[in-house]
């Protein structure tokens, strides 16, 4: 990880901080806290999530959704608001580089225990909490527009963005407050002591332009899980993932984040350490199930909104606009657009009546999907491609496996070529532990294009030395069925996604445990049909051996069944 993220890790950790809010007379580590991004250490300037300010708004949370509400001045909050920011020092070590180490653990900061001697330090101590003031609250109008399109209307009741688990009791008022504050952020001025003023400011941060990071690109999230709780342990915790989907400034990543990381920075590897976005909601729930995505707001439009807001405020505050980080441009010497991996554009949307799912083109006029997406042979289906431009082509199901077949596969012949859709190279071998990605239309369907999720190939299940099932740790959701599974290293097509895992006893779904059909099972038959239109090879799939059927029924072979002890 350090080889890929070395520079970005340093930038992320130097930019990370924790923000806590309390009422006058209460402990500094109050009940409201989140993560933040340090824009300047001297003078102190921090951007954090706005949700912690809802209890202090003079006009209540309804002011956040008022018509035309783009920013609110600092005096929108009550006078009893007390803010504190905590970050790690950036003092250079003996070698001239910034030291890196988790701060020494002092138990009373974590769990209200009797004071005692701190444990031996494993790094540098944290800075003491610094007082701060609210300069303004701001939102990104374009973020809200795309949020309403994706999560509003009839789907609104299915979605929750609460940091609480689905079984935790959260009042309707609290949930409404959280939703109103979802896309709001806060700009804070940090009051520094003489020691902090003299501290090294650290390298300048730059912001990645909107649209410069492609789907599937690796991302690094830096936040403080659980906010003000135990910063000795949790301050600036890192999480890796990829950019899963994009809708204007609304971004999704499969990096796993926890409550308290709201407002944390999201960084890219190219250019190293450029700020891409800030965390909006670390946990997303749909129909009571954890989706496995973290909701982000792109940094570039957010900083543009901050500049506009600062210029409307008194001159002393407006001068802070010069401290906001610039967007990546010519000085960095890198192109502003990255086409990303070719395989990220390989998935297509397959619609059969009211049913839809994913698919992958294996030839210009041949698409593979799942039987439960297109179950009937000769059925008419509509295949949509969204990259690089949206096209819709009618096709016909020429083959679908029988219900009793363990391989859930259907093959669609198209009336026209799928232009500009990359045809993947089928893999010949599989390597457990290799980095992989899934591309599919899960969760959003055609409203947001295909999503990319990352993980590893966790298992290759074989029967008589032949791979018959692949398992991955990628997040797979309803609608991803039929989508492609790719090797990140080679870009080759490894398999076809068929399902995630569901516990029939509890009803819980596990998106990070899923199953794919190895492409080596399908490739000879697909090649035969593509060349000769002969379905004989595909028909052989219906005659899969009993050991293969046992594997796909998730049963233990009879020879391995436990013997009775009676």
UniProtKB/Swiss-Prot annotation:
Pfam family, one: Trypsin_2
GO term, biological process aspect, one: proteolysis
Site (Cleavage): 110-111
Renumbered residue ranges of the record's region Serine protease: 319-531
Domain of life: Eukaryota
One GO CC term, this protein: membrane
EC code: 3.4.21.-
Active-site annotation: 372 (charge relay system), 408 (charge relay system), 481 (charge relay system)
Post-translational modification: Self-cleavage gives rise to an N-terminal 15-kDa fragment and C-terminal 45-kDa fragment upon import into the peroxisomes. The full-lengh TYSND1 is the active the proteolytic processing of PTS1- and PTS2-proteins and in self-cleavage, and intermolecular self-cleavage of TYSND1 down-regulates its protease activity.
Listed transmembrane segments: none
GO molecular function: identical protein binding; protease binding; serine-type endopeptidase activity
Main location: other
Family matches, as InterPro entries: Pept_S1A_Tysnd1 (IPR017345), Peptidase_S1_PA (IPR009003), TYSND1/DEG15 (IPR039245)
Keyword list, A-Z: Hydrolase, Peroxisome, Protease, Serine protease
Subcellular localization: Peroxisome
Subunit structure: Homodimer. Forms a heterodimer with the C-terminal cleavage product (45 kDa form). Forms a heterodimer with the N-terminal cleavage product (15 kDa form). Interacts with PEX5. Interacts with LONP2.
Sequence similarity: Belongs to the peptidase S1B family.
Function in brief: Peroxisomal protease that mediates both the removal of the leader peptide from proteins containing a PTS2 target sequence and processes several PTS1-containing proteins. Catalyzes the processing of PTS1-proteins involved in the peroxisomal beta-oxidation of fatty acids.
Entry protein name: Peroxisomal leader peptide-processing protease
Gene: TYSND1
């Amino acid at each position: 990880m350090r080889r890929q993220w070395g520079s970005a890790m340093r930038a992320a950790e130097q930019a990370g901080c924790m923000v806590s809010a309390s009422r006058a007379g209460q402990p500094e580590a109050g009940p409201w806290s989140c993560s933040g991004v340090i824009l300047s250490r001297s003078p102190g300037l921090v951007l954090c999530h706005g949700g912690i300010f809802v209890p202090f708004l003079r006009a209540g949370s309804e002011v956040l959704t008022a018509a035309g509400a783009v920013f609110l001045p600092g005096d929108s909050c009550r006078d009893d608001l007390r803010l504190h920011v905590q970050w790690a020092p950036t003092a250079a070590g003996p070698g001239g580089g910034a030291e890196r180490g988790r701060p020494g653990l002092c138990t009373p900061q974590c769990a209200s225990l009797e004071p005692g001697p701190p444990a031996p330090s494993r790094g540098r101590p944290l800075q003491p909490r610094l007082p701060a003031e609210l300069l303004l609250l701001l939102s990104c109008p374009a973020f809200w527009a795309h949020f309403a399109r994706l999560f509003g209307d009839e789907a609104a009741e299915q979605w929750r963005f609460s940091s609480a688990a689905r079984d935790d009791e959260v009042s309707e008022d609290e949930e409404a407050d959280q939703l109103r504050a979802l896309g709001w952020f806060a700009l804070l001025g940090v009051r520094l002591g003489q020691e902090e003023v003299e501290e090294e400011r650290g390298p300048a941060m730059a912001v990645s332009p909107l649209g410069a990071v492609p789907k599937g690109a690796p991302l690094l999230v830096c936040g403080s899980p659980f906010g003000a709780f135990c910063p000795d342990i949790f301050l600036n915790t890192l999480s890796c993932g990829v950019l899963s989907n994009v809708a204007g400034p609304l971004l999704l990543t499969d990096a796993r984040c926890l409550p308290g990381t709201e407002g944390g920075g999201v960084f890219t590897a190219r250019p190293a350490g450029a700020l891409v976005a800030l965390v909006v909601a670390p946990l997303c729930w749909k129909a009571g199930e954890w989706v496995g995505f973290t909701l982000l707001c792109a940094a570039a439009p957010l900083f543009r909104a901050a500049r506009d807001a600062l210029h409307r405020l008194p001159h002393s505050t407006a001068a802070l606009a010069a401290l906001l980080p610039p967007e990546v441009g010519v000085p960095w010497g890198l192109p502003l657009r990255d086409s990303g991996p070719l395989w990220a554009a390989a998935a297509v949307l397959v619609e059969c009546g009211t049913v839809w799912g994913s698919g992958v083109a294996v030839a210009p006029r041949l698409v593979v999907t799942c039987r439960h997406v297109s179950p009937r042979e000769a059925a008419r289906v509509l295949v949509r491609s969204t990259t690089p431009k949206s096209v819709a082509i009618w096709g016909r199901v020429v083959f679908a496996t029988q219900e009793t077949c363990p391989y859930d596969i259907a093959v669609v012949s198209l009336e026209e070529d799928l232009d500009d859709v990359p045809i993947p190279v089928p893999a010949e071998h599989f390597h457990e532990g290799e980095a992989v990605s899934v591309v599919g239309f899960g969760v959003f369907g055609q409203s947001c294009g295909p999503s990319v999720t990352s993980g590893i190939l966790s298992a290759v299940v074989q029967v008589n030395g032949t791979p018959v099932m692949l398992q991955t740790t990628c997040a797979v959701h309803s609608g991803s069925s039929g989508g492609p599974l790719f090797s990140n290293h080679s870009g080759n097509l490894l398999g076809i996604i068929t399902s995630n895992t569901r516990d029939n006893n509890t009803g819980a779904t596990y998106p990070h445990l899923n199953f794919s059909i190895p492409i080596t099972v399908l490739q000879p038959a697909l090649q035969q049909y593509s060349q000769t239109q002969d379905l004989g090879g595909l028909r052989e799939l219906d005659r899969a051996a009993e050991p293969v059927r046992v594997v796909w029924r998730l049963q233990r072979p009879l020879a391995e069944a436990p013997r009775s002890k009676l």
